[in-house]
Every structure is written in structure tokens, then in C-alpha cells.
A protein has these predicted regions:
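N-terminal carbohydrate-binding accessory modules
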Residues: 18-71
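C-terminal beta-sandwich/jelly-roll accessory domains of carbohydrate-active enzymes
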Residues: 457-463, 480-564
């Protein structure tokens, strides 16, 4: 009997030994999400905040997500939903979400809506909301309390942590072998709204007190790589190793923001470490980024991991794996560059789901080795054809889902995922994101400058599409795979030798099982970009290049040769 029990126990342990839980690992030049031992590209979408509170509602959503070509879904789990009565946990909803995802062959990332969601404590249990004496709030100027739990309360932290650890323990029990859940988002867009910092008595005392040595030590150790605005603020105040917050960072709202960032980082970092002690899944935060109309911290959630304060978060919350931006603004390429840092791999957990979202996904994954992309509110299918970002998309839901811009982009990215992930690790991939304000981009890759521009009508070059995008992978000497939509692509050598790059062979095709399967051999009208060959030759161009139409993203393979 004992032998049988031992064998059963060993058998139960085998899946864990054979397939480690999901993790972030550096592979070559990229940090990648590893699932069941293999790099994984998260082609994701996030449901609306309360969608996951109803399994009946989610039953109508799962099939749509499959049709949209998602492989990963971001869903909320609220503290209020799992601990409606203090000390009594109910994970029925969690188990139902796991079952729904597994039935539809989808992975999950759970969003822990605990102390804060969009800065406000709206998803905490009622027993927390009703007991302000025990669970203190933040105060703003004038002594007014707001519905935002204080970061400085040990009781707030301990209570949220207990619930979160119970949740992670449950995940370990029900998913350690299945690996349905890939990552955890810790809270949601934290930070104080309505003031630049907490004005409670506890916060005023902390602000007047010394900056923790963990932060000043981090600044000293990483002074050469700090975000420039943070480094300049610290150095302009004397680069002090000790002092009050005003003495170390100078007076002003930016110092208030740094102070709040430290407090939020310590709170979320402590929770993350406690959860990882039970079940060490990767954990990220998401950020409400500064909007053009914002005049200062407090208009956006002060303390959120903004570009200014990511270093503060790295110092205060080392257990958190990455800080991710929610990007709805048009300058997507700027924001991805500001968040993708050597110590901060890129993931975009909220963004657009229309044609702009398709371009965003290609750019983040190709240019910044993003581990994934996720438009928000994906259960509202009108977001696939949105006329404008935001809760009111201005569009009706499409009749079919799979042929919309983002699902078609996801289908091609899924097909190319092995090649993309390999190229991310090798550093042989780049991307272009184009619109009428930025109609062309040059990419330096391998021994060539790759010129990507919006696809032009050969008879009327002024006719260009509104959006175009491309991923370029260097596969060997003079060999490239290019995937894109509504762009045209030319190549120019950037090493000594003949000045003009010609197209030796161009193939349309697809990837199957990670291998290239050639289809049509493209030539003639397929690749002619410019009838003015004399003008092209004067610019060291052949007049030919790759053309990608607007009826859906496609991939081509090109082999180049050089001549003069």
C-alpha cells in the first residue's frame, strides 16, 4: 500500500518536473515568456473589467475570442469576488474561468483587482470599504479623504496580501500542472488621483522623513542608466545619499510623484513577493500613461510606473518582473520605446483592437521584442472596427470576426511565431509602423538599410493608405522575411561593394510548423514600384521592391544580390 501511494505521489510530481511553470527568461538578446519549456508569443486580449464576474456571460465570450485568433485572455479577479466575507475564500469563479479557457484551448493572465483599480479602491470587499478606521484612506489637500486606500497602512497591505496569497495558493493547487495561467497583473493602474501626493498625517511624516537608503543606494548604483529626468532631478539637488524627499529630489510635484511611486512600489512589491513564495508566476504592473491634457501628477495617477519613476519601481519592487504601459495614444512607437529598457521587457496589456491595434501588435513584437500585445475590452467586438478609441467606439459590432484587421494580423503572427521568437533572441528582427503623418521609415538590419513606406499607387503616388505596418527578419546573407500590410519595401546595402540591391528571388508563402513553405514566385508587376528606372538608378535603386496590399497582411521571402 505504501509503495502504491509513493508511486502515485511520484506520478503526480512528474508533470511539474517535466514542464516548469511559466517564466520569463532571457534568451539571447530578448527576455521571453517561456511556457512548457518553449518561447511563447502572447496574442492576447483583455475583457472588460467585470466581464469575468459572470461565468454565464463568459460562456458567450469564449467562442468569440477563439474566432478572433487569440491564444491568451486577460481577465480580472477581484478581491471582493473571492473574499466577500473576511477570512472566507470562494474560488468558484476562478475555477470556472480556468475551465472555460481550457475548454477553448486558451491561456489566461489573471488581473488581481485588489486595493486599487484605475487608482480607486472600487474592487475591495464591502467589509473593507465600510471600516475606514481599520482600513485608512488617502487624503488630498483640504484634509478630504478619497476612496483610495492608503499605501502606508500595514492593515491594508496585510489584508490584501492574505487574499492574494490564498488566490495564488489555489492557482498552484489547480493549475501547477496545466499551466493555463501564464502571468499575473498586480493591481490595475495604481496611483493617486486628485492630488500630487497623499496629505494624511502618516504621509506627511513619511515625506518629511528620510528617503529610504534602498532607493538612494539604487540611484547611486545605477546612476549611468537612470531615466534622464530622474537622474537630472536627483543630481540637480546634489545627488545626495541621504535626506528628506525634498532635500534629495528638490521641491515640486515631481518629487511628490517620486514619493508616491516608492510607496506604491513597496506595497505591490511586498504583495508580489508573498505570492511568489507560494507560486512564482511572472508578475507585471500596468500604467495609466500621461495624457496630453494632463497638467501634472494627480491628473494622471501619481505614483504609477511612468517613465520618470520606473527606476523607483525597480528599486522598491524587485519582485515585479516588468512594468507595462497601457497605450491608447497615437504615438505608440514613442511609448513602447520609453518602456522597453534593458531591465524592463515590453508587454502591452491594454491598447486598441482595430487596424491601428494590428499595426501596434506588429511594431511592439517586431521592434521591441514584446512578449505580447493585448487590446482592451475585447469582448466588445465593435473595438475591432473602432472609429475612435475609448468606451464609445463609434462603430457597430462586425458581422464576422476572423477577417477583421487584428484577427488577421494575429493569424499571421501565430503562423510566424517560431521565426519571430527566434529572431527576437538573435536580435535579427525589426518593425515599421506607418501612417500619413509618418509615411516612411528606414530600418538598419544585417548589412542593409530596409526602407519601408506606405504603399503607393504607381500612377498616382499621392494615393496612400491610412495605416501600414511591417516586420522584417534577417534570415541569412542577403535573405529576409518581410510580413506586412499596405507597405512597399526596398533594400540598400550599407557595406562596401556594389551600391544597388536587386531582387534575385521573391516568394510569397507561409510558415508551417516553423518552416517556410514557398508559394508563388513574384516578379514583374508584383514587384515593380517605379516606372522611372532612370530616376531610381540615380538614387541607387532598382525600381523594384516588395509590395504588400491592403486586403490582409502577408509574408514574403526575398533573396538579394548586389550590382552597380
Amino acid at each position: 500500500m505504501k509503495k502504491a501511494l509513493l508511486l502515485l505521489a511520484l506520478a503526480g510530481a512528474l508533470p511539474l518536473a517535466a514542464a516548469p511553470i511559466p517564466a520569463l527568461e532571457r534568451r539571447g538578446q530578448a527576455v521571453q515568456l517561456i511556457v512548457d519549456g518553449q518561447p511563447y508569443l502572447a496574442l492576447a486580449g483583455e475583457t472588460a473589467n467585470t466581464a469575468s464576474s459572470s461565468l454565464e456571460y463568459m460562456d458567450t465570450v469564449w467562442p468569440k475570442l477563439v474566432e478572433m485568433r487569440l491564444n491568451t485572455v486577460l481577465v480580472a479577479v477581484a478581491w471582493d469576488w473571492v473574499e466577500p466575507v473576511e477570512g472566507k475564500y470562494d474560488f468558484t469563479l476562478v475555477d470556472g474561468l480556468l475551465a472555460g479557457a481550457r475548454q477553448h484551448h486558451l491561456h489566461l493572465m489573471f488581473l488581481w483587482f485588489g486595493s486599487w483599480k484605475n487608482g480607486i479602491s472600487s474592487f475591495v470587499p464591502g467589509w473593507v470599504k465600510a471600516d475606514q478606521a481599520r482600513f485608512p484612506r488617502t487624503q488630498i489637500k483640504g484634509g478630504k479623504s478619497v476612496e483610495i486606500l492608503s499605501t502606508l497602512s500595514a492593515t491594508n497591505l496585510q489584508s490584501d496580501t492574505r487574499a492574494y496569497v490564498a488566490f495564488m495558493q489555489h492557482l498552484r493547487e489547480v493549475d501547477a500542472a496545466e499551466h493555463t495561467v501564464l502571468m499575473i497583473q498586480m493591481q490595475n493602474e495604481v496611483g493617486l488621483l486628485g492630488d500630487s501626493r497623499d496629505r494624511s498625517a502618516a504621509a506627511e511624516a513619511a515625506f518629511a522623513g528620510p528617503v529610504p537608503p534602498e532607493l538612494t543606494g539604487y540611484l547611486q548604483q545605477h546612476k549611468d542608466t537612470l531615466w534622464p529626468a530622474l537622474r537630472h532631478r536627483w543630481q540637480d539637488a546634489g545627488a545626495k545619499a541621504a535626506g528628506s524627499w525634498t532635500e534629495v529630489f528638490g521641491p515640486g510635484p515631481a518629487t511628490d510623484e517620486i514619493f508616491m511611486a516608492w510607496n506604491y512600489a513597496r506595497y505591490l512589491g511586498s504583495m508580489t513577493a508573498a505570492g511568489k513564495a507560494v507560486y512564482p508566476l511572472p508578475v507585471y504592473t500596468n500604467s495609466w500613461i500621461v495624457q496630453p491634457e494632463d497638467k501634472g501628477p494627480g491628473d494622471y495617477p501619481t505614483g504609477c510606473p511612468e517613465p520618470l519613476t520606473i527606476d523607483v519601481w525597480k528599486a522598491g519592487a524587485p519582485a515585479i518582473d516588468l512594468n507595462a504601459p497601457d497605450i491608447y495614444l497615437p504615438n505608440f512607437n514613442d511609448w513602447t520605446g520609453w518602456y522597453h529598457r534593458p531591465n524592463n521587457p515590453l508587454f502591452v496589456p491594454e491598447s486598441r483592437g482595430d487596424i491601428v491595434g494590428a499595426a501596434n501588435a506588429f511594431y511592439a513584437i517586431g521592434q521591441h521584442a514584446a512578449i505580447g500585445y493585448s487590446p482592451f475590452g475585447i469582448d466588445d467586438t465593435s473595438r475591432l472596427v473602432a472609429l475612435r478609441p475609448g468606451p464609445d467606439t463609434g462603430a457597430a459590432p462586425p458581422a464576422t470576426l476572423g477577417n477583421q484587421p487584428l484577427p488577421r494580423a494575429y493569424a499571421l503572427l501565430a503562423e510566424m511565431a517560431p521565426a519571430i521568437l527566434d529572431a527576437q533572441a538573435r536580435g535579427t528582427i525589426a518593425a515599421a509602423w506607418l501612417n500619413k503623418e509618418m509615411p516612411a521609415q528606414d530600418i538598419t538590419l544585417a548589412d542593409y538599410t530596409v526602407h519601408v513606406e506606405l504603399r503607393r499607387n504607381r500612377r498616382d503616388p499621392t494615393q496612400v493608405p491610412a495605416v501600414g505596418y511591417a516586420i522584417v527578419i534577417a534570415a541569412g546573407p542577403g535573405e529576409f522575411y518581410v510580413a506586412g500590410l499596405d507597405v512597399q519595401v526596398t533594400f540598400a546595402p550599407n557595406t562596401p561593394g556594389p551600391e544597388i540591391a536587386g531582387l534575385a528571388r521573391v516568394e510569397a508563402g507561409r510558415f508551417t510548423g516553423g518552416r517556410w513553405q514557398p508559394g508563388r514566385i513574384l516578379s514583374g508587376d508584383d514587384i515593380l514600384l517605379d516606372y522611372d528606372l532612370a530616376g531610381a538608378a540615380a538614387k541607387n535603386q532598382s525600381g523594384s521592391g516588395l509590395r504588400f496590399r491592403g486586403d490582409g497582411p502577408a509574408v514574403q521571402r526575398v533573396q538579394l544580390y548586389r550590382y552597380r
